[in-house]
C-alpha cells in the first residue's frame, strides 16, 4: 500500500465495493426492515467502527497487553466494560467476543468439559444453534438435553423443565431463545439450576435492549453468566459481550483470550462502548417502549378474524417482546412464499420454522417479524398500525402487491434513514 492509496477514499480505490455499499444504503432506506435480529446502528457507532482503532493490535486485557502502544485502546475497552456492568448491574463484563456465537462458545468452554451435559431450548422450538444444535460445536462437544415448548400453548412450562433437569442432571442450563415471543422466568430457571447443581447461563441476545430500558426482567441477578449480542435490540455493532459473577471472571476471560480468540477488534469494542452509553439514555428507553408497542400492535392485527379465516395465526397468541411469530401451517402460503411476497411489497422479514414444523428449514411454515429497526427509524403507534395492516393484507389471497408497496413507500419517505448522509 502506498501513501497515496492510504489517503484515497473508497470510491476511488474500489468503486465496485463502494457501489455495493451505496446500493445497500439505498435498500435500507427504501424498505421496511423487520428482521427481528436486525437494527440500525447510530451514526456514532458506525463512526467508531470506521476509526483508526481498526489498525491496533491489543492481545490481552487492559493493563496486561502483549503489545505496546495500547494506552488509548485500554481507555476504550475500560469504558465499554464499565458501561456494560453499569447498564445491566453485572460484576464483570468481557467485551472482546467477536460475536454472540463466540461469546456463547467461550461460556461453554469456561463452564464445561467435553461430554458434560448442556440443557437448552430446542432449535426447532425457538432456541439458538449454539444452544445444542447437533452440527454446531455445542452439539458436537457436549451432551445435549433439549427442552421444548408445550404443544397447547407454545410456551415453556417450568414444571416440565424442572422434571427434565432432575432426570438429565445438566452441568449447565441455558435460558434464552432466537424465536420465542414471551418473557422467561429467570428466578425459576435459577432455582432449578441450584436444585440440580448446574450453572445458569442466560443468552439475552434478542432482548438485551429491552432489559437495558427496564422493560423486561433482568437476568443478570439470577444467572451465573449472561451473554448477548450488541446489534439486535441494543442497536450497536455486530459483536458479543459476556457478563458474569465476580468469581467467574478469571475463567470467562481466559476462555475468550487466549482460549478462543487472539487480538480483539478494538474498533468494534469502541462501537460497543458508544452503544452502551446510548442504551443508558431516556431516548433509548422510549425507543424500546415503541418497539414493544409496535410488536403488540402487529400481533393484534395478525390475530384478527379476517386472517384467521385464511389460516394465519400467531404463536402464543401475542408477544411480550420485540417480535411476533406467525404460524402459516393452515395457510395457503408457506414461510418462503410469505417472505418473498412481503419482500416484493418492500418489507424484509425472515421465514422461520414453527414448533413441529412439517416443512423443511429452507421453506418453513412461519415468519419471524420484528419491530426494533422501525422503532429506531422513528415509527410510533400510528405507523405500526399501518405496517401491521400492510402485512395482514399481504398474507391474504389476492393481495395487490403494487398497492401495498405504495403504502410502504409513503412510510419510508416519511421517516428517512440516515438523513444528510449522501455517500457512505
Swiss-Prot record:
- Per UniProt, what is one GO molecular function of this protein? glycine hydroxymethyltransferase activity
Catalysed reaction, written as an equation: (6R)-5,10-methylene-5,6,7,8-tetrahydrofolate + glycine + H2O = (6S)-5,6,7,8-tetrahydrofolate + L-serine
Taken from the record, one Pfam family name reads SHMT
- Superkingdom per UniProt: Bacteria
Write the signal peptide boundaries.
Answer: none
Where, per UniProt, does this protein localize? Cytoplasm
Instruction: Report residues binding (6S)-5,6,7,8-tetrahydrofolate.
Output: 123, 127-129, 245
Q: Which InterPro entries match?
A: PyrdxlP-dep_Trfase, PyrdxlP-dep_Trfase_major, PyrdxlP-dep_Trfase_small, Ser_HO-MeTrfase, Ser_HO-MeTrfase-like, Ser_HO-MeTrfase_PLP_BS, SHMT-like_dom
Q: In which pathway does it act?
A: One-carbon metabolism; tetrahydrofolate interconversion; Amino-acid biosynthesis; glycine biosynthesis; glycine from L-serine: step 1/1
What are the residue positions of the site described as Plays an important role in substrate specificity?
A: 231
Query: Is Membrane included in the keywords of this UniProt record?
Result: no
Q: What class of enzyme is it?
A: transferase
How is this protein organized at the quaternary level? Homodimer.
Assigned protein family: Belongs to the SHMT family.
- This chain belongs to the protein called Serine hydroxymethyltransferase
Organism per entry = Kocuria rhizophila (strain ATCC 9341 / DSM 348 / NBRC 103217 / DC2201)
Amino acid at each position: 500500500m502506498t501513501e497515496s492509496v492510504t489517503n484515497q477514499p473508497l470510491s476511488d480505490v474500489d468503486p465496485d465495493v463502494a457501489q455495493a455499499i451505496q446500493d445497500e444504503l439505498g435498500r435500507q432506506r427504501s424498505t421496511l426492515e423487520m428482521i427481528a435480529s436486525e437494527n440500525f446502528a447510530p451514526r456514532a457507532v458506525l463512526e467508531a467502527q470506521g476509526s483508526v482503532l481498526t489498525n491496533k493490535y491489543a492481545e490481552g486485557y487492559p493493563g496486561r497487553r502483549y503489545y505496546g502502544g495500547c494506552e488509548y485502546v485500554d481507555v476504550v475497552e475500560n469504558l465499554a466494560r464499565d458501561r456494560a456492568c453499569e447498564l445491566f448491574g453485572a460484576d464483570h463484563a468481557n467485551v472482546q467476543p467477536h460475536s454472540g456465537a463466540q461469546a456463547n462458545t467461550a461460556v461453554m468452554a469456561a463452564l464445561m468439559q467435553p461430554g458434560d451435559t448442556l440443557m437448552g431450548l430446542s432449535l426447532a422450538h425457538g432456541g439458538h444453534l449454539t444452544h445444542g444444535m447437533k452440527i454446531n460445536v455445542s452439539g458436537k462437544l457436549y451432551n445435549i438435553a433439549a427442552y421444548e415448548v408445550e404443544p397447547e400453548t407454545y410456551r415453556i412450562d417450568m414444571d416440565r423443565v424442572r422434571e427434565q433437569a432432575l432426570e438429565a442432571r445438566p452441568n449447565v442450563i441455558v435460558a434464552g431463545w432466537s424465536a420465542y415471543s414471551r418473557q422467561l422466568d429467570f428466578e425459576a430457571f435459577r432455582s432449578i439450576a441450584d436444585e440440580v447443581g448446574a450453572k445458569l447461563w442466560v443468552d439475552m441476545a434478542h432482548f438485551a435492549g429491552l432489559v437495558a430500558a427496564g422493560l423486561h426482567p433482568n437476568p443478570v441477578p439470577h444467572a451465573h453468566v449472561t451473554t448477548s449480542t450488541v446489534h439486535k435490540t441494543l442497536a450497536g455493532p455486530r459483536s458479543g459481550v459476556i457478563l458474569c459473577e465476580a468469581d467467574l471472571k478469571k475463567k470467562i476471560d481466559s476462555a475468550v483470550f487466549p482460549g478462543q480468540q487472539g487480538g480483539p477488534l478494538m474498533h468494534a469494542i469502541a462501537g460497543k462502548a458508544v452503544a452502551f452509553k446510548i442504551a443508558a439514555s431516556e431516548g433509548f428507553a422510549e425507543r424500546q417502549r415503541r418497539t414493544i408497542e409496535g410488536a403488540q400492535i402487529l400481533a393484534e392485527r395478525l390475530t384478527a378474524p379476517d386472517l384467521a379465516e385464511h389460516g394465519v395465526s400467531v404463536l402464543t397468541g401475542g408477544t411480550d417482546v420485540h417480535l411476533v411469530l406467525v404460524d402459516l401451517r393452515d395457510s395457503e402460503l408457506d414461510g418462503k412464499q410469505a417472505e418473498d411476497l412481503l419482500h416484493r411489497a418492500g418489507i424484509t422479514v425472515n421465514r422461520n420454522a414453527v414448533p413441529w414444523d412439517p416443512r423443511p428449514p429452507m421453506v418453513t411454515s412461519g415468519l419471524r417479524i420484528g419491530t426494533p429497526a422501525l422503532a429506531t427509524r422513528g415509527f410510533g403507534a400510528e405507523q405500526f398500525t399501518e405496517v401491521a395492516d400492510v402485512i395482514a393484507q399481504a398474507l391474504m389471497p389476492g393481495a395487490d402487491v403494487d398497492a401495498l408497496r405504495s403504502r410502504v413507500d409513503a412510510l419510508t419517505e416519511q421517516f428517512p434513514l440516515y438523513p444528510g448522509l449522501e455517500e457512505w
